Each structure stands twice: as C-alpha cells, then as structure tokens.
C-alpha cells in the first residue's frame, strides 16, 4: 500500500495522476494485480512561472506550498521545484502534525534520440498518535448503551468508565507544566533526543519518518516504433516511533 504522507507535495507538482484498476496491459515496468498508479511530473510540460498556495482546515490545519517552474530553456533543459510546509493540531486530541515535503524535477533533451530526467522527493514528518482502542463508553455512554449486548456495568457509577471523555479523547498524551524540560526520544538517521513538539504536552505515542526517493530516467528513441526506457533509482528512509517500554499497570 501507499502511505500518502511520504509523497506529500508531489501532487502539487504533478501534471496528472493516472489510475488503472485491476490487472491489464500497461507500459510500466512493474504492473500490479490490484492496479497501477502512474504519477506524471514532467518539468518540460510546465510553463515558466511559480505560485504560492495556502490551505486551511479543521484542527488548526495549515499547509503552505511554494512552487516554481523554469519552463523549457533553449529547447533542452527544464527545472521544477516544490516545497511544502504542513502543521496542525489534529482532529483528535494530541494528534498534531509537523511536516515538510520537497520535490525537485529536471528534464534534459540531449538530442532527438536521448532524453534524461532526474527526480528527488521526500517528506520528513512527525505526528502525535492515538493508538490504543478503548471501551466505547469511554467516548460515549449513550452510544455504548444503544448497542445490543453491551454490558451496562462497564460504565455504572464508581466503575472505570463512570465519566465519558468524548470522541476527541486520546489516552496517548497528557498536559504537562511547561517548566518540565524532559526531551522526546527521536530516531532519524541515528538515535537521539529532541525537544518536545509542544512544551505544554507530552506524547506517549509519536511517529517520525522520512523516506526520500531519487530516480534517474533515460529515454532512447531507437526508431519510430521502438523506445528503450531505463530507470535507476534509490529509495532510503529512516524513522520510527515512541511508546511505552516494558509493562504498564494501574
């Protein structure tokens, strides 16, 4: 499957996204039984110019995008670049987002037969998580009571779920005094600690990841009926997540 957060920003630089459902004949090297997705980002197809875009949404969501295209230079070279900054508090408590994304594309038409393309994309990101399931009554006693067969004793007075927390409840974070200077574990190309995302809170579960991808394409038009396409690519990555070590009891 595709984690779209690892490709964040590439849609802002794409010419088109082609979707093919099921197994069928495609002109790609790696067809799939479930289907094929082809993201086209041709720098030579863009006119010269740039744009700045901002998107806002619920939960303090803010996404800022900066894009520039050189257009075709001397009928041979074209460059394209995109930088994205995305932040947000999240819909569920403690599920904030702190992310960047980048895209660089270049195309060089050497002659009538040979064309080269170089691309690099990535999206270093950091998220607060809501990982564990809870009893339905934790979120809504009314909903829990409407379910046939639900044990009412799970939320009677004095029991664990006496007070519902609401749909936005997340047990994987808690507020802390900002004077607390404890740091968060971090593994991004090596283990270390880093400042917490927010000095007023502490996340038990946090995810951080960066999966860059670089590929070099070569297209050789052998004749009017034959083309050779070659791709050399590298895909790296580093990241992980925080969590409770050992056992937790109450």
Give the label of every model feature segment.
Residues 29, 57-60, 94-98, 198, ...:
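Short sequence motifs at beta-strands and strand-loop junctions characteristic
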Residues 23-27, 90:
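Short beta-strands and strand-coil junctions in structured, solvent-facing domains, enriched
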Residues 1-21:
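Short acidic/polar hinge/loop motifs at secondary-structure boundaries
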Residues 17-18, 37-39, 230:
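Non-catalytic regulatory/gating segments with a bias toward low-complexity or hydrophobic composition
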Residues 198-243:
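Outer-membrane beta-barrel transmembrane strands
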Residues 157-210:
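A conserved mid-domain beta-alpha-beta active-site/ligand-binding segment of alpha/beta enzyme cores
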Residues 49, 56-87, 92-131, 139-176, ...:
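Transmembrane beta-barrel wall of Gram-negative outer-membrane proteins
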Residues 19-20, 48-51, 86-89, 99, ...:
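Extracytoplasmic loops and strand-loop junctions of Gram-negative outer membrane beta-barrel proteins
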């Amino acid at each position: 499957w595709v984690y779209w957060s690892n490709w964040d920003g590439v849609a802002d630089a794409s010419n088109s996204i082609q979707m093919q459902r099921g197994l069928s004949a495609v002109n790609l090297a790696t067809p799939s039984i479930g289907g094929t997705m082809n993201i086209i980002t041709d720098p030579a197809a863009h006119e010269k110019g740039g744009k700045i875009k901002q998107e806002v949404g619920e939960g303090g969501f803010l996404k800022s995008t900066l894009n520039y295209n050189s257009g075709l230079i001397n009928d041979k070279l074209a460059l394209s670049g995109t930088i994205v900054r995305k932040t947000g508090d999240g819909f569920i408590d403690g599920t904030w987002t702190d992310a960047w994304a980048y895209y660089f594309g270049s195309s060089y038409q050497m002659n009538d037969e040979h064309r080269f393309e170089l691309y690099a994309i990535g999206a270093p990101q950091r998220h607060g998580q809501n990982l564990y399931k809870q009893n339905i009554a934790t979120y809504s006693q009314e909903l829990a009571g409407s379910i046939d067969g639900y044990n009412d004793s799970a939320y009677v007075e004095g029991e664990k779920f006496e007070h519902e927390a609401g749909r936005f409840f997340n047990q994987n974070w808690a507020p802390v005094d900002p004077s607390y200077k404890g740091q968060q574990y971090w593994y991004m190309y090596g283990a270390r600690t880093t400042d917490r995302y927010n000095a007023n809170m502490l996340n038990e579960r946090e995810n951080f990841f960066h999966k860059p991808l670089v590929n070099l394409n070569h297209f050789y038009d052998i004749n009017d009926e034959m083309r050779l396409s070659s791709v050399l690519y590298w895909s790296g990555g580093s990241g992980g997540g925080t969590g409770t070590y050992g056992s937790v009891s109450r």
